[in-house]
Amino acid sequence: MVTTVNIALHLTQMATSHPAQLAVMVPLGRRSNGERNYASYTYQQLDEQSDLLAAGLDANGIGRGVRTVLMVPPSLEFFSLTFALFKLGAVPVFVDPGMGIKNLGRCLAEADPAAFIGVTKAQIARVLFGWGKLSLSRVVTVGRRLGWGGLNLAAIQQAGQIRQSEITNRELRWSAPATTRDETAAILFTSGSTGVPKGAVYSHGNFAAQVEALRQTFHIEPGEIDLCTFPLFALFAPALGMTAIIPRMDFTKPARVNPQEIAEPILRFGINNLFGSPALLNRVGREVQAIESRTVSFAPKLANDLLPPWTSVRRVLSAGAPVSPMILERFSQRIPQDVQIFTPYGATESLPVAVIGSHEILQETRHLTARGAGTCVGRPVAGVEVEIIEITDTPITRWDEKLRKPQGEVGEIVVRGPMVTQEYFRRPDLTALAKILDPTTGQMLHRMGDLGYFDQQGRLWFCGRKSHRVVTPEQTYFTEQVEGIFNTHPAVFRTALVGVARDGQVQPLLCVERESRRSLPAAHPITDANLITELLEIGSAFELTRAIKTMVFHPRFPVDIRHNSKIFREKLAVWGAARFK
């Protein structure tokens, strides 16, 4: 008998065991007293609504195996449609709308979708830019249709009601197909922060393994309340039995979030779990710091939400880019002393891989980072095997034990486990570069494209992206090790090492983004020239950075759209090269 594997099964189980528990809450406007209204689904309502939509979509040709672009912002419709597609065995295609029109078009052409479900704004863009015009046969609009045909959500719901009413035994409900562990569940396009976005093919087994890894690693229990600030991660909340509360924010710009929209629901609903990008934690932490020091004017309501400790919080998760100790330190002031900010390490193709908590970072590893050790990302999670192999930019077809590097030596990080995706959609060239076949299991290992090493305690250290290493005639620089040294200066927000061609050779260039003026003590201003002098002095103390002599200030680093934290070093390299022609 084939076992059904599907992330939507968790939803149905919760609807049976905890039907009245709230599954998801999304923000609406504010009442006259200033309190925000929310729309919500209980687990029973979300399960029934996703069943209804699944039946309606199936009746209109969107069924098992049908690749379906879903461009709906976080909302009740987003959750019900996503779980409907999973129940159907359809293949939702998730593409971040913030990756830019050119990359969006390329991703959608590559995905070759047969169906497109989107809000009115997304449908307008589809028509204007010709997305999927050669492959689409089904279009569903969430909202108003403006003459492009297809169906709206009400029509899908009506079709679902008709399909369900056709079942002769009223005790039965519309039945989803039995999806298997290795069956394709979704295609998730990576951010493209280190190249062209590519579609990671997720199986139902990958999602099931992720849910279990998150549950075990962070001891998440049903009934917890989760504040979801990253849309795709929000889908795990119902699967884990949590209540997902969506804040009012622009999810493509977490660095610009209104801190009150984070603090208010934490206090009002007693949030237990918070997932936020480093940029979001930085924004909220800085606002609290500014209010406490009275360096900015603020509304009393903001102070009332931000200043009281958030005693209900049990854990904070932050991912998408390395989280600086200063960000951890600031945000830790909001939560109980025994609560940690965890920084899970992974990628779209494999998550989670390793994890470390803020206590270990702030008490120990930050001091090693400041001396050039890189960023400690912790120990591998249960069920994941991590290897360090020789650095090469060429494909590796088969796994061999001889590929391993000794403990302590920097190499490429390679992972295997049930949450590791096996291929990129219709990109055999990129699959060949990123995957290694294990002939003993028939499964693929994933090359993370990251560099790192294991220390004597079995902790994994991240040293930067393989494609970002700076190779000069004298030595090879690994970005995370170099930047950790210079980032210790209090007037520096962050740095980025890039390689630029000068006099026919590659030379290291350190780009510096200054700390905001309001964050520095007014009595201790520092000029750009003096800051460069002090950075050169810091660098001269370490063999790793002694030869870095060229530095330049950048007003604001270009960063990825998803987390506003991952630095686009390729853009900085082009910018830096132009400065030194």
Q: Can you annotate each of these PLM segments?
A:
Residues 24-83, 100-105, 202-205:
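Conserved AMP-binding/adenylate-forming core of the ANL superfamily
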Residues 20-22, 169-189, 196, 219-224:
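Conserved pre-ATP/AMP-binding loop-to-beta segment of ANL
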Residues 496-499, 509-510, 536-581:
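Conserved C-terminal "lid"/linker of ANL adenylate-forming enzymes
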